[in-house]
Amino acid sequence: KVSLQELLSTPNNKSLLKRLGRENILSSKSEPGTQAIFFASAKSKPELFYLLWFYKDEAAYKKHVASANYKKFTSASAEILASKKAISLKKRATFSKNLTPERLKDAYFHITNLSLLAKSDAKFEKLVKKYMQKSVDEGAYAQFAFSQKDAPNKWVLVEIYKDEASFESYRHSENYKAYAKERAGLIDEFDGFGLKNETSFSKVKF
């Protein structure tokens, strides 16, 4: 089970949202069914945040959203958010390598929202799995691909690297060039941007 939220803080409340997010995430770490949480802010728009959760199953998700610390986070953050959007996702491909606290601390995240052309879903999933695994083998910390439950042609890709230089270096690799060439005939439009890690942890290998 996976959950994604896009949070936009009001202009003067970025620091408060970071603190509230951090408290909620650190409290959630002890929940057995919560596998990983990634909380990051957009580099070009620091008041825009993304919260990505991975749960063992639906029961673990329900337990988390019913918890006192999650309710506290929701009510406290409601007052300082300009907008909040929950995006319902289906996991399509996930690969990771050594997502330790030390590695995640200064990690560079990249999120891409894309729309596929009609009937490209299965082909794109195959393509993503092929190249994402290789990317993690070649140095990326993690590669996650999801489709939106209510719009299966809309996908969200989340990538984690050591830093922005590692991300740029991957973009010039033969693996990425081959992927970009193959996906060209499947994608209608896409938009990607960098994120800065705020508070993240992972207790599992994807």
Residue ranges and their predicted role:
Residues 1-49, 56-66, 71, 78-206:
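Short S/T/G/P-rich N-terminal loop/turn motif that feeds into the first structured element of a domain
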